[in-house]
Amino acid sequence: MARKKSMVELHRLGVEDYKKVEKLPVTVVLDNVRSEMNVGSIFRTADAFLIERIILCGITPQPPKAEIHKTALGAEESVHWEYYHTTMEAITKLKCEDYSICSIEQGHDSVSLENFTPEKGQKIALVFGNEVKGVSQEVVDCSDLCIEIPQHGTKHSLNISCCAAIVMWNCFAGKNS
């Protein structure tokens, strides 16, 4: 019978040790995300999958905020983050740093997530959009590609934190395969 692991058996790193661990060359960009709970959840997932940083843009809430902390469980302390007034400022900087800009958006030329495998060492910026409007068209226009999660139900939409978790896991799993 399976037995749950104790906290000791999980071998959790402290914040300072976590900051020293090699991260994936993946940056998450949040394009005008409204919900503090979604932001906190994305911080927590980024911590789990060794994402190098999160860039918060526009109206996206920034730590310290109670709701971010509640859902992040402190991951806003371990994951490096930056803020930009506009997403385009962040995209311009990332392009100068040789990142491939990958908007997570349903588009006419989107690549299905199951067909997306980053090259080893490739620097990727994953852009996730607003809960209602998605990634802004201006950002989509500047992207190197759009990635879409295949969906077969009636809604054809996922909560941004769920979407981000699926895509971050895909990048993490690809690194370890």
Placement of each model-derived feature along the sequence:
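Post-transcriptional modification and biogenesis factors for structured RNAs
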Residues: M1-S177
